[in-house]
């Protein structure tokens, strides 16, 4: 078992990582091969379009590394579904867009591997909460039952 030196978490554009900051400094300070990571990451995420991809890079004592890509952030997927550039300036006071419950379910299905639940309904409620906190209205959501 190799000794772990560092675990670096970054959010990078799919297929477009470069050795420039934030990648270079984050990996360089731990002695990992930056170009090797950039090539491997870009190859692994080339088919994901223009999404932002969270990645967790584990760097070992022998300067080798492994990385795990996660699903794009909920906020990115919600903005994409609502066709927005960014969330509300004053969430709760202003609504900047709306998404349907069906879109929420689609996002929840996509995010399932990274969420701490196996229940699609619970995952959808998490996504709906994220949407509301961004000032995006969720249309057609079922009534919430008190637990």
Swiss-Prot record:
- Pfam families in the cross-refs: Ribosomal_L11 (PF00298), Ribosomal_L11_N (PF03946)
Main function: Forms part of the ribosomal stalk which helps the ribosome interact with GTP-bound translation factors.
- PROSITE patterns named in the record: RIBOSOMAL_L11
Could you state what the record's PTM comment says about this protein? One or more lysine residues are methylated.
Its BP terms in the Gene Ontology are: translation
Name of the gene: rplK
Under the heading SUPFAM superfamilies, the entry gives: Ribosomal L11/L12e N-terminal domain, Ribosomal protein L11, C-terminal domain
Q: Which UniProt keywords apply?
A: Methylation, Ribonucleoprotein, Ribosomal protein, RNA-binding, rRNA-binding
Q: What is this protein called?
A: Large ribosomal subunit protein uL11
A single Gene Ontology molecular function, please? structural constituent of ribosome
Which species is this UniProt entry from? Answer: Thermus thermophilus (strain ATCC BAA-163 / DSM 7039 / HB27)
């Amino acid at each position: 078992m190799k000794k772990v030196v560092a675990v670096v978490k970054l959010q990078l554009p799919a297929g477009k990582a470069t050795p420039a900051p934030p990648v270079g400094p984050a990996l360089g300070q731990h002695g990992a091969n930056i170009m090797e990571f950039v090539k491997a990451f870009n190859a692994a995420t080339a088919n994901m379009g223009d999404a932002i991809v969270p990645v967790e890079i584990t760097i070992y004592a022998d300067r080798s590394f492994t990385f795990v890509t996660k699903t794009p952030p909920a906020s990115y997927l919600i903005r994409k579904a609502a066709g927005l550039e960014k969330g509300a300036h004053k969430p709760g006071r202003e609504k900047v867009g709306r998404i349907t419950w069906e879109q929420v379910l689609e996002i929840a299905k996509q995010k399932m591997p990274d969420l701490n639940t196996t229940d699609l309904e619970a995952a959808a409620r998490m996504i709906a909460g994220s949407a509301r906190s961004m000032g995006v209205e969720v249309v057609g959501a079922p009534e919430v039952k008190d637990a």
